[in-house]
């Protein structure tokens, strides 16, 4: 999920998992019986301590990277009036708001797709 505010996107640097030292945002796996939207909201609360309001679907990606193969569903989430904070220090080591035109590198592959989708409207990213 991405959060955009005033031309900036919130990103956190991954730690202790696949894609280590890449920049991403909240995300994770579905729990049994959970919808995509419920999962996105739960992960945002667990990892960043924010309650997501409106969600807008961005894209789906077939990702083969980091020694894994997974399907990624991305949303744009509204967290108006809230400031994300790292709730899981074992998962992220740094964070901040970054201008959409000057992003840190490297981006987690799914985050790159989400940001490209936000900018271009592309909704499907085939496997790499």
Language-model region placement:
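N-terminal strand-loop-strand
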Residues: 1-24, 52-56
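Short, charged/polar surface micro-motifs in flexible loops or helix N-caps
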Residues: 4-9, 17-19, 31-32, 76-83
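Conserved hydrophobic/aromatic beta-strand scaffold that supports enzyme active sites
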Residues: 11, 74-76, 97
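Nudix hydrolase/Nudix homology domain
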Residues: 18-20, 89-128
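A generic structural micro-feature
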Residues: 22, 65-71, 89-92
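The catalytic Nudix box helix
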Residues: 25-57, 75
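Active-site-adjacent beta-strand/loop module that shapes the phosphate/pyrophosphate-binding cleft
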Residues: 61-84, 111-119
């Amino acid at each position: 999920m991405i959060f955009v505010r005033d031309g900036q996107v919130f990103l956190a640097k991954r730690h202790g998992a696949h894609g280590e030292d890449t920049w991403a945002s909240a995300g994770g796996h579905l729990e049994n019986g959970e919808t995509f939207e419920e999962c996105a909201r739960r992960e945002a609360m667990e990892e960043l301590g924010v309650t997501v309001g409106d969600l807008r679907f961005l894209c789906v990606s077939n990702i083969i990277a980091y020694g894994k193969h997974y399907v990624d569903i991305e949303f744009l989430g509204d967290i108006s009036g809230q400031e994300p904070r790292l709730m899981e220090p074992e998962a992220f080591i740094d964070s901040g708001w970054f201008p959409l035109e000057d992003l840190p590198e490297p981006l987690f592959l799914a985050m790159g797709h989400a940001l490209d989708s936000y900018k271009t409207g592309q909704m499907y990213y085939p496997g790499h």
